[in-house]
């Protein structure tokens, strides 16, 4: 089985459903597949001795060593779009090591899970957490990103750089 994703009558990607979800070819497909949709934020790519990093306004996130280094190299010092799905962000207890933190604006109970809408420096991130997560609206949420699930997109062309 394959799904064709089109935008304005133009085929964006023709792939099995899991490939569309795991390896979207551009920002449109990444945002189209999945509910809630993928989170996006601007970051700057940095090269350090221990690998590549994505710098946000509040710090840096180490990128997976599995990412294509040749694809990342031309983007050092440039702004790209980082994408990550809500289920690939963990809300951890405050005080634990984390990548980002932000204020919980909405805690949307969905039954066995809760969708946290977190304001991170003016960017709204949706985080899918267990319904037992103790944080509520107004609290600070400490977030850990699954580095193996980070997607990077060219800010100008919107094409995928690396997954």
Which residues make up each language-model segment?
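Non-catalytic connector elements of ABC transporters
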Residues: 36-41, 47-163
